[in-house]
From Swiss-Prot:
Family statement drawn from the similarity comment of this UniProt entry: Belongs to the BORCS6 family.
Description of how the protein assembles with itself and partners: Component of the BLOC-one-related complex (BORC) which is composed of BLOC1S1, BLOC1S2, BORCS5, BORCS6, BORCS7, BORCS8, KXD1 and SNAPIN.
Biased composition (Basic and acidic residues): 1-10, 71-83
Region entry Disordered, spans: 1-201
Gene field: Borcs6
Compositionally biased residues, Acidic residues: 144-156
Keyword S-adenosyl-L-methionine in record: no
Protein's recorded name: BLOC-1-related complex subunit 6
């Protein structure tokens, strides 16, 4: 037990006639008081008795062991506010009773764990003597006009809120993700229990819903009860029952601005112009298609007539060739007697040549 935190400071004077008091102050860390509350001097016996009561009710604290007085080190002065109120929890004359209606439990005699950075800490001062003492609770309400403290709290909350996504973005592995989600406080417990539990992997959520198998870089997943899941996903969601209590919050008013009628008229006019242009475009496109169709039909008919004429010409040439061949055969048969006459003429010439030779 520390002397500065477990005992009261220098003797103080109490203006009231009570022998034993419990005073509780609550406020923000940055609050300051212009003057402390008045108190009377405690005797050495009462201080020893107060220390004995605190030692009989030990309570573990995350920071230091607590006594009958607990305060944060950064709060040095107290703020005197006109709205502070003191409420006696028991009669001043009844000192022999074991407690009063508002006497706090023994657990409230000791400081609570130190709050986090995002929450304002509360200062609690408990000074108790005998079990039948008088308790006074003094509350210091928060100031609404303290803009500096509110700004500091908001900046601390923003830093605490942005630190978690930044840690998630910087981590590149599942171990980093799990460490970022668990926080710095759970790192030691995670290291201690790493041997007993299974490490988180990518397929651990999939293994709960089906079978996962890996082949190289490919991961195959087979879902269990696929038909049931499809049937459940297609089922309509149940309509929540209408509550009998009327809705206290008014329905949100639509934020759609009023529509300008000139805009509607311009839109209608432009739509009509666009429709007329589209109609004219479709008509021109239809006429062009008809002209192309007629030209295609004319080309097809011309090609058909040319093919028919060419076929007839080829047929006529084939017929003339066969006719010529037939005439040549007839001529050959007609020239066969001419060859006999040619032989006779050659014989007559030889005979004439012999006769001429004899006459000389």
């Amino acid at each position: 037990m520390e002397a500065a935190r477990g005992r009261l400071g220098p003797e103080q004077d109490l203006s009231t006639g009570a022998d034993h008091q419990a005073v509780t102050f609550s406020g923000r860390p940055s609050r300051t008081l212009s003057k402390p509350p008045s108190a009377r001097t405690l005797s050495g016996e009462e201080e020893a008795e107060s220390v004995g009561v605190a030692s009989r009710h030990p309570r573990p604290s995350p920071k230091t062991s607590s006594g009958s007085i607990a305060h944060r080190p950064e709060l040095d002065t107290w703020e005197d506010k006109p709205s502070a109120r003191a409420t006696p929890s028991g009669a001043r004359g009844s000192r022999g009773t074991s407690g009063s209606e508002h006497t706090p439990p023994p657990s409230s005699w000791y400081p609570e764990p130190e709050p986090s950075e995002d929450q304002p800490s509360a200062l609690t001062v408990c000074r108790r003597g005998s079990p039948g003492g008088v308790e006074m609770n003094v509350e210091l309400p928060q100031q609404e006009g303290d803009d500096d403290d509110d700004g500091d709290d908001e900046e601390a909350a923003d830093r605490a809120g942005h630190s978690f996504p930044s840690r998630l973005q910087d981590s590149r592995s599942l171990d980093g993700l799990s460490g970022a989600c668990g926080g710095g406080g759970s790192s030691s417990s995670g290291e201690a229990g790493a041997g007993g539990g299974r490490r988180a992997t990518i397929s651990s959520p999939l293994e709960l819903e089906g079978t996962v198998s890996r082949h190289g870089d490919l991961t195959h997943f087979v879902a269990n009860n696929l038909q049931l899941k499809i049937r459940l996903s297609g089922a309509p969601s149940p309509v929540p029952p209408a509550s009998g209590r009327p809705c206290l919050t008014p329905a949100p008013t639509p934020t759609i601005p009023p529509i300008d009628p000139d805009v509607l008229r311009d839109l209608e006019r432009l739509s009509r112009e666009l429709g007329g242009r589209v109609d004219r475009l479709l008509c021109g496109l239809g006429g062009a298609v008809q002209e192309l169709t007629a030209l295609s039909v004319g080309c097809i008919q011309t090609y058909r007539d040319a093919v028919d004429s060419l076929g007839e010409a080829v047929d006529m040439s084939i017929k003339g060739m066969y006719t010529l061949l037939a005439r040549c055969e007839e001529l050959e048969r007609a020239l066969q007697p001419v060859q006999g006459l040619a032989r006779q003429v050659r014989d007559i010439r030889r005979t004439l040549e012999v006769l001429e030779a004899l006459c000389k």
